[in-house]
Every structure is written in structure tokens, then in C-alpha cells.
């Protein structure tokens, strides 16, 4: 950090360090409130924030709010049939043999995955393990605001929002 200060660096941007199955290098977040052990502990993060602050360097986190990992508690609860959490994501009731749209995932193949136990499809614009959040749901926006407040209260000075340009989805899927 001293070397960065000597270079007059005033912000340090780090990619996702949260709990993740790492199917997409951490961009598949399973818990926004915990540090992936591959990168250290929450105490390590607190120390990094403090040491950056001591040098006048702001720490900026990369936040992934278009989707979560399918291992996230919200998605697991959605799969368990909890309607509240199904509304956190974009599910469609089309028959198993009828994909809701012809949209393609950025990772290849259809952007929809069928869940036989629910008889529903969920949207994943990226990897099949990255279920898109439903930004039309005010509870989702509220949960994500809590995440931001949590990290701001820890001393994070800025955020980069990954693929924020795709959070808005049309009401009518064609």
C-alpha cells in the first residue's frame, strides 16, 4: 500500500471477494456479507480498509447486482418453493418443452433454465449458475441497499456495479 501511495494512487478497486462457488471468478456471489476464504477473512478486509484509509486511499468494491449465484440463500429458498424468494428472481411458468424466449446466455445456450420441481424456468443472462435478480421487486432493491450500507459502514469509499446495464428487463418477454 505504501508503494501505491508513493504512486499517488487514491483509489484501489478490487473485484468480488465475497463467498462464491467461483464458477465465474467471483462474479457469482453466494453471500454479499462474507469474505471468500480464498481471499482472507472479514478481519483481513477490515484491516485493508483501515490501512487504505491511513494512506488516503479509498477502497472500491466490485458489486454484482444483476444476478446472484444459484447457491445464494435467496435462490435456494426460491427453489424450496418460497414465493417471496421466487419473486426475487425472474421465473416463468412456460411448459418444460417451451423455452420462454429465444434469448441466449452470454455464456452460450439459452438464457433460461428449467426447474422440474417448480415447473418453472428462471432467467440467467450469464452462466446457468447465475440467476438474474428481479429489479422490479422493491424487496430486492431494499436488500441490495442493505448490502451497500453494510459495506459503506465498514469504510468502503466506492462501488463499481458490474453489468448494471442489464438489470432492466422488459415486462413482456418476446
Predicted segments — roles?
Residues 157:
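Receiver (REC) domain switch/active-site residues of two-component response regulators
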Residues 1-145, 149, 153, 164-174:
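Acidic/aromatic-lined carbohydrate-recognition and catalytic surfaces
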